[in-house]
Structures are given as structure tokens and as C-alpha cells.
């Protein structure tokens, strides 16, 4: 080591320059205003592509959209979707059972993307809980109820997102 380098190292160590540089940075951020969001009282805006609680949609005439193609069940990487179907008198298929286990679901959105009739969607609802494991097991009727309740919001989000697809 040269004499200049050893003198420089001595001054850095003796005067604790690294510590002073760190304290300067800490002081600068300490005096800046806080950007913390107080969550239950304040909420940040959500993207139209936010993926929350699932819902099944209906057509305007009240008929459920799901045609029991089972693409969502096949594409689900977590195997959280279970579908059973039967053939109706007119030859079309409809679901008799459509269950989503939210304890398995990873909210990837593949089910929504694979659905050819926009039946299964993920809403902006993220404030839900379950006290027992079975509370997070959503049946067809529960999913349809969520879809019926939030249909206007779902349609608005689909329309806002349509420009980017």
C-alpha cells in the first residue's frame, strides 16, 4: 500500500467518514414528510386489473354465463377450481357445481383470461376473511351472489381494461 492510500484510510477510519455519510442520508430522509397510508381509514386507488375475490357473472336476461367448458379448471395452476356439469334438454352444457377453494388460489388470473364468455372474473374485493377453513370455500351460489352484487363495478372495470387488451 502506498503512503497516500494509508493516510487516506487512516483519516477515513479516524474521523468515521462512512458513519457521517450514513447519518447525513438518514437525517435527510428523517426530515422529509411521511408517505405512509393509514390503511383502514385511507385506501389507495386500485388498478382496473387488480385481482381480488372471484365472481360468476350472468347475462342481462339472468342466465348464468358459464358454459361448463372447464378451461378455467384445466388452466388453474393451484387446482383450486372444481367444476361438474350436465347436459340440458336443448343440448347445451351448464354447471351443476362450481367451487373455488380460496385457500389454494394464488390469484394469478388465468381462469379469468381463459374464460371464452367472461363468466369468471376477479373483482376488486380484497377485504374478506374466514374464521374457519370452510369459510374460504366458495360455491357456485356464493360466486353468483358476488357477481350479482358487483356487476356494475365489474362491467366498468372490464370496459376500462378493454383498451389495453
UniProtKB/Swiss-Prot annotation:
It is found in: Cell inner membrane. Pfam families: Fer4_7. Binds 2 [4Fe-4S] clusters per subunit. This is NADH-quinone oxidoreductase subunit I. Its cofactor is [4Fe-4S] cluster. Residues 57-86, 96-125 form the 4Fe-4S ferredoxin-type domain. Its EC number is 7.1.1.-. The keyword Membrane applies. Keywords: 4Fe-4S, Cell inner membrane, Cell membrane, Iron, Iron-sulfur, Membrane, Metal-binding, NAD, Quinone, Repeat, Translocase, Ubiquinone. [4Fe-4S] cluster 1 binds at residues 66, 69, 72, 115. It is a peripheral membrane protein. [4Fe-4S] cluster 2 binds at residues 76, 105, 108, 111. GO terms for molecular function: 4 iron, 4 sulfur cluster binding; iron ion binding; NADH:ubiquinone reductase (non-electrogenic) activity; quinone binding. It catalyses: a quinone + NADH + 5 H(+)(in) = a quinol + NAD(+) + 4 H(+)(out). Belongs to the complex I 23 kDa subunit family. It comes from the Bacteria. NDH-1 is composed of 14 different subunits. Subunits NuoA, H, J, K, L, M, N constitute the membrane sector of the complex. It comes from Methylibium petroleiphilum (strain ATCC BAA-1232 / LMG 22953 / PM1). One of its GO terms (cellular component) is plasma membrane. GO terms for biological process: aerobic respiration. NDH-1 shuttles electrons from NADH, via FMN and iron-sulfur (Fe-S) centers, to quinones in the respiratory chain. The immediate electron acceptor for the enzyme in this species is believed to be ubiquinone. Couples the redox reaction to proton translocation (for every two electrons transferred, four hydrogen ions are translocated across the cytoplasmic membrane), and thus conserves the redox energy in a proton gradient.
